[in-house]
Amino acid sequence: MASLSEFVSEPISMMSQTSAASESQCYYNETIAFFYNRSGKYLATEWNAVSKLVMGLGITVCIFIMLANLLVMVAIYVNRRFHFPIYYLMANLAAADFFAGLAYFYLMFNTGPNTRRLTVSTWLLRQGLIDTSLTASVANLLAIAIERHITVFRMQLHTRMSNRRVVVVIVVIWTVAIVMGAIPSVGWNCICDLEQCSNMAPLYSDSYLIFWTIFNLVTFVVMVVLYAHIFVYVRQKTMRMSRHSSGPRRNRDTMMSLLKTVVIVLGAFIVCWTPGLVLLLLDICCPQCNILAYEKFFLLLAEFNSAMNPIIYSYRDKEMSATFKQILCCQRTENVNGPTEGSDRSASSLNHTILAGVHSNDHSVV
């Protein structure tokens, strides 16, 4: 007859074996090649002409991204006409794009054959930096959309958001971005469940990619709805102004020009990032689709987006363009270093012109 100690020791032994088996299912010590080979994603062994060209182009674009967005941040800092909450948020968007440039710069030196040298931790860091930069950009664009919506519909000449609140918003944006980028590193990955591994991102779990992709796409939709609401409101006010106001047409043209600038910035972001996010969903929902053939193209498209905003500002905003030239030419003028007469009126903010037209319209109707 078995003794009591045998009955007790047998379950304990089984539990320890189960625990050991469970631990053996995690592959933290495996090479990156192990995950890539299992997912079927190609992992280069040597540099070819195309890889060198892509790396050279990528590094060049990264340097331009960082310098151009640094120029935007400096321009907003030195020109007091830009010292409004909306421009602080735009500066933070430039900071997010600057961070994206750093993330892509790190990626360029750890891609191709160099990917094989990465550990699980450094691979997750590489991807986490890109995820953080995207989340920061999305959250910042959403904050700008909400600020514009509130300001326009409350008919305020200047937003009542204090500088302290702007700082709080910026801190929240970066906190959310860092958390979203760090989630896979702290456990939401497929290292312990290889069946859930993605083909495009071999160490990421499908469930996390679904969550991350849908989160960003829903945010895109919310921003589009907010700006569409603003656009309809502005168009209605413009029509009323044209019927009842004898004010100059220049104000209305400026108003629509500023609205177009905002829409172009948002539109460029959505156009550059949506294809890549949809590709992630196809990777999960359509395993037979050859989505890996298009991965690098969409990644490059997303990278170019971080360089677009400074170009858009330079082309669409004369004040910003003039400030860029003064900085690059090392000029110091009264216009840049201090507010001039009527600088508040000339600050290129959408709601300034809207409200001028609205008040003029109300007076004419009365």
Curated annotation (Swiss-Prot):
Chain ranges on the Extracellular side, renumbered to this chain = 1-52, 110-123, 187-206, 283-296
Major subcellular site? other
What GO terms fall under cellular component here? cell surface; cytoplasm; endosome; plasma membrane
Q: Where would you find the membrane-spanning parts of this chain?
A: 53-77, 86-109, 124-146, 166-186, 207-227, 258-282, 297-317
Question: Which residue intervals are topologically Cytoplasmic?
Answer: 78-85, 147-165, 228-257, 318-366
Where is the protein situated, by its record's location annotation?
Cell surface; Cell membrane; Endosome
Can you cite a GO biological process for this protein? adenylate cyclase-activating G protein-coupled receptor signaling pathway
What tissues harbor this protein?
Answer: Expressed at high levels in oocytes and at lower levels in brain and spinal cord. Below detection level in lung, heart, kidney, liver, muscle, stomach, and intestine.
Q: Where does a 1-acyl-sn-glycero-3-phosphate bind?
A: 41, 126-131, 212
Q: List the disulfide bonds.
A: 26-192, 190-197, 286-289
The UniProt keywords, alphabetically, are: Cell membrane, Disulfide bond, Endosome, G-protein coupled receptor, Glycoprotein, Membrane, Receptor, Transducer, Transmembrane, Transmembrane helix
Q: Which GO MF terms are attached to this record?
A: lysophosphatidic acid receptor activity
| Residues annotated as glycosylated | 29, 37
Membrane topology field: Multi-pass membrane protein
Against InterPro entries, the record matches this protein to:
GPCR_Rhodpsn (IPR000276), GPCR_Rhodpsn_7TM (IPR017452), LPA_rcpt (IPR004065), LPA_rcpt_EDG2 (IPR002277)
Q: Kindly give the PANTHER family that the UniProt entry links to this protein.
A: G-PROTEIN COUPLED RECEPTOR
Record-stated family: Belongs to the G-protein coupled receptor 1 family.
Q: What does this protein do?
A: Receptor for lysophosphatidic acid (LPA). Plays a role in the reorganization of the actin cytoskeleton, cell migration, differentiation and proliferation, and thereby contributes to the responses to tissue damage and infectious agents. Activates downstream signaling cascades via the G(i)/G(o), G(12)/G(13), and G(q) families of heteromeric G proteins. Signaling inhibits adenylyl cyclase activity and decreases cellular cAMP levels. Signaling triggers an increase of cytoplasmic Ca(2+) levels.
Q: Indicate what this protein is called per its UniProt record.
A: Lysophosphatidic acid receptor 1-A
This chain's source organism reads Xenopus laevis
